[in-house]
Amino acid sequence: MLARDTGRLQRTALHALHVSLGAKMVPFAGYDMPVQYATGVLKEHLHTRRSAGLFDVSHMGQIVLRAKSGRVEDAGRALELLVPQDILGVAPGRQRYAQFTNEGGGILDDLMVANFGDHLFLVVNAACKETDEAHLRAQLSGMCEIEPLPDRALLALQGPKAESVLAKLCADAPAMRFMDAGPRKVAGFDCFVSRSGYTGEDGFEISVPAGQAEELARLLLAEAEVLPIGLGARDSLRLEAGLCLYGHDIDTMTTPVEAALEWSIQKARRSGGARSGGFLGAETILAQLDQGAPPERRTFWIDHSSAASTGVVMVSMSWP
């Protein structure tokens, strides 16, 4: 963990709310973020599994990708130059998990891509959002307009009771299916809502104008089922669910196949598919899909109360 230096850290629109709720604030991806509240990481983790937790993920990047032709299909074709996923197959009102790859097939970042009817809406990782934007501009500026949305916050409401909670503020919420995404009214605010998340639970991610984020967060926290949840529990929840964290489980030296993410590469982009290849790193990734590759990502238990830090050498004294 980096040493705390709030003088150089950015703050999300919910920073004052976190402090008022007694959050322990730590540096993360250039932001002063809540790692936990007084309830502690374990209780926050279990509460999300049993009820509903509210996460501030406003540090993540939100980007609009709009084709200069005005056709969302052209934006999809352009983005398919940079990711191995079938973006043209994402119907309006739906979203898909994807990865930016480099020439060697390594992962530059992972992201969500939503089709909003006349443009694509991307959510990228906080630590990579500036390089992702630069990558998009360098590769696609001749075909697309790239518009970051720094004036929007992003909230994640996660857990088995997330639907019943959000339904009180958004009448459309119960009808949304997993990975549905699009503009919705939430408490009268103009939001972008997806039925998704990164905890392994049912839930919703809500993009809201930054100036309205605290009011919306307070409305959600006023529900008895909802507790504020920090990044510590977000990390343990995604790890328990087997979800990758960029920079830890995946990076530029790991291909999607080596990361056991081949499930995210649709048939249309594979060998023999309708639009096979054509993305950065296609030669390596398609060869691995066809011939196999040893997995670089594994999950195992440590029989100790302390967590292993990133980069430490793991030794098993009883490995067969």
Describe each model-derived feature in a short phrase.
Residues 1-100, 106, 231-232:
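Acidic, proline/glycine-enriched N-terminal capping motif
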Residues 81, 85-139:
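Well-ordered mid-protein domain cores that form the structural environment of catalytic cofactors
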Residues 44-50, 100-110, 139-142, 185-192:
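Short amphipathic beta-strand starts and helix->beta connectors
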Residues 61, 96, 109-110, 180, ...:
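Residue-level marker for the onset of beta-strands and adjacent loop->beta junctions
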Residues 56, 110, 205:
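Acidic active-site catalytic centers that drive phospho-/nucleotidyl reactions
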Residues 2-27, 33-35, 115-320:
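Conserved, structured C-terminal
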